[in-house]
Amino acid sequence: MSAWVLPDHIADVLPSEARHIEELRRGLLDTARCYGYELVMPPLMEHLESLLTGTGEALDLQTFKLVDQLSGRSLGLRADTTPQVARIDAHLLNRKGVTRLCYCGPVLHTRPDRPHATREPLQFGAEIYGHSGLEADLEALQLARECLRVAGVRDTTIDLADMRIVRKLLAGVALSPQRLSRIHAALAAKDAGELAALTHCFAADSRAALLALLQLYGDEAVLAEAEKALQRIDGISPVLANLRWLASRLEGAQVTFDLADLRGYAYYSGARFAIYARGASDALVRGGRYDEVGAVFGRNRPAVGLSLDIKQVVGVVPPQTLKAAIRAPWGEAADVNAAIAELRAAGETVVCVLPGHESEVDEFHCDRELAQVSGRWVVQAV
């Protein structure tokens, strides 16, 4: 095998794309800061039990594992940053009241989570801890929309669901993990035949409600249909009211609902959202409420958050036009170096042309040059 061949779904990022990624990273972190989020930088590697505690089987399967040569303990390379941020909130900061944290860094996956995806996403995320009200859910949605706007993503659709609906329908039913997994799969695939077979011994109301879920997707009219179809199930009306409240406050947004969507079922504890955009094969942003995420670290605080893969977003939006640069001659003279330093301090990109490479070009388009005119160094058009 050639030494330059990389593993499957791992790739080098070349200059043009790297510039786009870095510009977007800066823009997203600046946006989060404008909303009051503080930046944290968890390590890429942690003890395995810290990374996986309370996160479910899916994250376990996505996590690369290795043995620490110093301690002999099992380590993991993070596949998701949220558990680490929950640990920071619960154990290191240990603040009272609301805490807003954001992060941006690479994660590693043992398998790509969608066709043609990288196994090394650059994950950006933001978390709100300490508020159980819908105001925090709404803020996470608003921040997610603003992040996509900053990235240049247009024509988005927000899909809302709530994990509590299915949990209430399955409450009191004794199910093996295998059967529960099959029920989840049938709901996700909207397979009425399989779901009917798996729930044949359920109480009539629960079975009818589960089968009705398969048709409960679409615009806001779905919520009214759900009120009728699920009226015999205790506690459903407040959940639907919460979804209606959130949707009504997303001004100018196209909002849909899929009440059988169970992605993140083992993770989310309430409302969850996904934002789709034209040209993207999967959701660009996912988020929701996961109130139990910090319990394993000693603080069971309300929590809402969102995350996205910057590399995925970059793939669906055109890069910003690169600001034209200034070409300058390489030299040791103090006057030319002073002129170059002054231009760079003013925010200009100045590319020094090395001797013998005057005809070479790179990513930077130079529409001006630094030239000596009448003993002075001046910038003039090329």
Swiss-Prot record:
Which pathway does the UniProt entry assign to this protein?
Amino-acid biosynthesis; L-histidine biosynthesis; L-histidine from 5-phospho-alpha-D-ribose 1-diphosphate: step 1/9
Its localization reads: Cytoplasm
Biological process (GO) annotations held by this record are: histidyl-tRNA aminoacylation; L-histidine biosynthetic process
Keyword terms, alphabetized: Amino-acid biosynthesis, Cytoplasm, Histidine biosynthesis
Q: Name one GO molecular function term.
A: histidine-tRNA ligase activity
Family annotation (NCBIfam families): PRK12292.1-1, PRK12421.1
Recite the other comments. This function is generally fulfilled by the C-terminal part of HisG, which is missing in some bacteria such as this one.
- Subunit structure, per the record? Heteromultimer composed of HisG and HisZ subunits.
Q: Which family does it belong to?
A: Belongs to the class-II aminoacyl-tRNA synthetase family. HisZ subfamily.
Write down what this protein is called.
ATP phosphoribosyltransferase regulatory subunit
The gene that this protein is the product of is hisZ
